[in-house]
Amino acid sequence: MKQPNFLFIITDQHRADHLGCYGNPIVRTPHIDAIAARGLRFNRFHVATPVCMPNRASIMTGRMPSVHRSRSNGIPLSLDATTFSQLLLEHGYDTALIGKCHLQNMEDRPPLVDPEDVGTLKPTPGYAEATHSDLEQAAYRQELRSTWTDPGHRLTLPYYGFSYVELCNHHGDETYGDWSRWAAAQMHDFEAHRGPGRGIPDARFSAPQARRTPLPEHLYSSAYIAERSVDYLRRHVASGSRRPFFLKCSFPDPHHPFTPPGKYWDMYSPDSVQAPETCAEPGPDAPAHVRWIHEERRQGKSLLTAQRMFAVSAAETREILALTYGMITMIDDAVGRILNALRESGLADNTVVVFTSDHGDYMGDHGLMLKGPIHYQGLVRIPFIWSDPAASQTGTSTESLGSSIDIARTVLARAGIAPVNGMQGRNLAPQPGVPAANEPDSILIEDDNQRAYLGFSEPVRARTLVTASHRLTLYLGADWGELYDLNADRLERHNLWEQEPVLRGALLERMVQKMMTLADRSPRPTRIA
């Protein structure tokens, strides 16, 4: 059987219901909707963790963060980890990544870690951790912004299994990598047209991190990824290569800051969008961590320009939604260009097209913005669309639970490649376009943070179990948790933790069973004893 090509499209911080094909009546995404119309849409697809770096590692390895060990932002994925792109490359695929990677650190700022013990002998770098690895060596500094100030810097290839990479890391109009060199070649002073402090004044918008960028549309990251992806497809055909390809198009948007360029800034008016029904001050029965975030904003202590979550008003939410929709429509236009090139190149009939994201965003749910260890559905539920030209059915959807760890095994199975020992996900589509019959009874979500906040005295650690009907979340060190009936209470307003002790106990037992199931099975024993 001929191996298919793969066009793998991933966005950043993009919740499932911010697409037309997932029921959003406002945002215009005709090209992504067309992928769904030709494919299989998963309506209950969830992250392994709602954080960029570790969930991207889970996607590439098919393993939970606690197992691949990139548990949070700031911990690079080990170069010893086996990614599904490495297996594709090993079995004859051309593997390419254009856009954001984030399997290694982007920021040069130091971590938020406990202070070192005073008065003790410190281990050498090679012995500072439980495993003999030095994550400060040059091989783990390849994606740092500071590293890319060297005009001669390039990623060492193959990079986590990608034999070709054009990097565009970070977010909004603050991206860098191969993109910034490409942009500088077209606009000599482009650095003066992007970033904080260089926005075009617009009195209509005052929401945190909303900035009208002077960067032209054709130099923005989404346009770059479209142009370079189209070029890759055309070069692949022109080369006469008989090798199948896996092309990962990784968009840094619609992650904040909210900087849609040109016409996309004005495409949606805040007056035309509605804040979520739950976008209000939390009542006394709201979970303690939600009340903490709102109190932080009332006291003027919120970090409104940083990466972590903050409380928002309904007016701020409408502004941010309008700009986010503009960023999403720009991505959709870019996707349209790539799909058109796929058809024009004669590749569409043997190319599986996949669309997903690394995690969602609160976007005003419960008066919250961005992301954090509060596992509302807007954050942990993401789009996943699998469009296979060999499918006998198209335009179908499934309510079967799915997880980011399922992606690796699903891609490998379609390519006819066996998974490695320790790969934890399942094949979502054993028959082209048909969801797997062995539906899981639950999925697990992990969340390990560097920060101690939300009222916790230690860095927040959470575990969530999602079943067909409920969501249960447990926090380390807390004598309370969260339990919601997702069928009767889809907005997650009524916490049943105290009212339903029998159900709570049953779900906690299922969570432990799930954690045991997801314990590492690698390496295999090499002898009986």
Region spans (language model):
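C-terminal extensions
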Residues: 208, 217, 513-518, 529
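Charge-dense polyanion-binding interfaces
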Residues: 507-525
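Short, flexible loop/turn segments with low-complexity composition
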Residues: 423-426, 519-529
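Catalytic Cys-His active-site segments of thiol-dependent hydrolases/isopeptidases
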Residues: 485
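Intrinsically disordered, low-complexity polar regions and short flexible loop motifs
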Residues: 489
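Formylglycine-dependent sulfatase
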Residues: 1-471, 475, 481, 494-509
